[in-house]
């Protein structure tokens, strides 16, 4: 009998043995039982791609247990094998709302009882539990969900359960206040007998049946008030760590914090990454004016690393300074920088290329740091591949064809716009030498900002040493300047890479971001949050940051990502600050956003309000889609594919005249049916950029079988239109030799933001192919021609209206125009540009006593005349060909002379024409 009992016991004991984790059970509790309103889970393996996980259902009915709903995850799937952490976010719909805004990670042990790991979550609670009785787990009892001032004497609150007004009480620095409370179900408002005092702490207490709960009242609802700005709007220029010869001064804006401690480290590397968490010293900071905290050291602390430990209410946390100017690995700790000790030899402040008078003189080339040098055919030093220093290596070739920096110089552009090179935090800088990570994970466009004023560590030779990234980036700007190329910075102030756990939000919750009426992060960026540029200290940060980059690194321009999420006043403030440094600094951006936003349309820095920003340019999606077709429909063609619809023609013409209100131009198909750019200096004309398909891939996807033989001609014509248009031309790196982005899974990659180098790299071996070299030489000639002839670079709407005329408008498939009157002091009297998108045809040239000199056709372009035609003569135009002719010639003076405030100096630009340069003010 005893033996039989033992047999019965054995299976039970065996079942309790731990086994490898194969299943994850996620238990989730919501107070309102509103799971059916679209709640789901976003789950991802650490450093891997995420995906939606739905809660379990049985015959379309949600499965519930004693805790709440349940989601089952199979951890034997390939993406979850051999991982130690899984990221988790509870969300409603496709990011309509998030429960807990920051990322949390489930720790996956190697084994667990029964092979199934259970994890428990509660709405609004940051904690997670690994059992229902886990002492470190979440609390399911009722609580206060939110309480914040909406006026100086009024608080709005939300509870998990209904309470009577008598169950609520408000305290000011521990003293009970006299209030009037109006309760409606689980929400209500509290009216104070007097206005609140920003220097005091307010706490709401609620007596639930499960016990007394407290909540620190926040200022979220009055951040936009004049009273808050007057109390805490700091206008000093000393935020961050400022190093002098024998001292270092720290100042942090943290107006609601009760204490701030400065932590000094000898290393920027935490123990988790092989460094140390031992603090060399800590200092209690002193609360000072306008919500700032300060500490002064009598030492030059250059090379040390620092963080702040901040207490807000019941929460204490350590974070990096938003004003940090360099950092250790992965941007976790800021670095104290004495820039006098990091400048490369010969570096000179306020030294930029003096290569433009007006924005229309610029030719912008958009490039990613890694793309230039990632492929083996670059043939530069291996240690510089994908790094800042690789951008400026000279003498690199592939089969006698220039690569890298020499290619850029040979092309002849005036400015390079680099995709984000601030510290974007997505790339794990501790894994840069891991071959697996190099193959899949090391690449990112960089649009998820971590530290706005810190150069990206993965682009430096040593991300563990914060001085390297500073010195090496300055070497880049210095080398560019010496080669007469301005460096434009792609800036992403419209959102932060992290939301609730970003350093901005940890320091002052809810201030730097716009929130929805429910208190969630608004998502106008499409990345989880958006910043509130209209607030005083956010605006100040943006101005301070751009001024810092312009002055410390000699940046020549700024491209604003999703600029419509910013407000007009902030953009104009940035312009004022930057133009005071150098009047030729370029400022432009994307006049759209990435989702719905609470920002008032009346103040958004978008197309409608561009007229209120006289020195801010904007990308011209009208000409982009007119030339090649919509970026949102791969198969849709535009002008170069043979399109003749009025909207195609008119959108292309709109770009040709530089986005101005040109007489006779039909604006029906232009945004808001208006010439919204207002001036050619504000019109960034382009056909392709890092977003969407490359031009070559778009042409492959949008042409018929019969048309594919003309793709190289279309590739040339697309930017022949851009480079002969009024406005500011913008080229995507590699477009000049038919760059493609072949997707890993086949086809073409239209969104390669985290695709591997194999997708994004510039293939110099392909440039060397004959057909691609012919396209490259054509682009090089176009650029030289534009630089030599100011008629293509008029700066005002009136100049364009006075000198440009469209011709051959009765000819289908033709867009043609003349630029007359020796426009903008050109040497050519009248220039005729003809774009033919269809079949071979013949045209009668305009009459005139002087002949027409053909200088560009589908294969040749330059200053030398290919053929001369009589006025009124017949000219043949091939399929998908652009012709450029001129009539009349007037040489410019060969001696320096003053003409309208400019110096006219003949220059040999690849053997072409002259360039009009303005003397820099000293």
Where is each model-derived feature located?
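C-terminal beta-strand-rich structural cap/linker in extracellular carbohydrate-active enzymes
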Residues: 302-304, 867-893
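Conserved alpha/beta catalytic core and glycan-binding cleft of carbohydrate-active enzymes
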Residues: 334-341, 575-576, 580, 584-738, ...
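Substrate-binding/active-site clefts of carbohydrate-active enzymes
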Residues: 370-553, 566-582, 586, 598
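Short, surface-exposed alpha-helix to beta-strand junction/turn motifs within ectodomains of secreted
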Residues: 37-47, 160-179, 258-280
